[in-house]
Amino acid sequence: MSRSLRGAWKLWGSWCAVIAYAGFLAYMSLRQFGDSPIERAIDGVGRAYFHLPAYAGLAGLLTLVMPSSGARGRRVGIAFLAATAYGWLLEAAQIAAPTRSFNLRGLAFDAAGAAAGATAAFVFLVLREKKSRRGS
């Protein structure tokens, strides 16, 4: 398999992972919340706190799979905005979902998680670039 074809498959697979993860977030955000022991434990902690790692993961994935043309900062900003907007869209969609409700705290944790994930991915990219320069 040629190098360019292998790169295309890798990129396609990466975007499939982002789409699958976004679908998982939508499912978890919009499904009915039941009364199982796990769900009662989640309620005890507070559902909004789960937004932090969820949207950190989405923003991190987006940062890593976006094309590297242009400034890294732009890539991080776009990933942050996209993950935050997606979280806010799902938060607004919860208005119509039974057993769910719109929550301002959820909006704040979506944005905070997206910022943390995009920043962590940015640091990873910078360190990886420095390491590859030293190795060359």
Predicted features by range, described:
Residues K130-S136:
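Short, charged juxtamembrane terminal tails flanking transmembrane helices
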Residues G13-C16, G23, G77, T119, ...:
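Alpha-helical hydrophobic membrane-insertion segments
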Residues W12-G13, V45, A71-F80, N103-L104:
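Membrane-helix interface segments
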Residues D35-G44, G87-A115:
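Interfacial helix-loop-helix junctions of multi-pass membrane proteins
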Residues A17-S29, R75-I95:
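Small-polar-interrupted transmembrane alpha-helices in polytopic inner-membrane proteins
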Residues M1-V65:
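"…centered on the first transmembrane helix and the immediately adjacent amphipathic helix/loop
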Residues A54-S69, A114-R128:
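Membrane-interfacial alpha-helical segments at the cytosolic side of multi-pass membrane proteins
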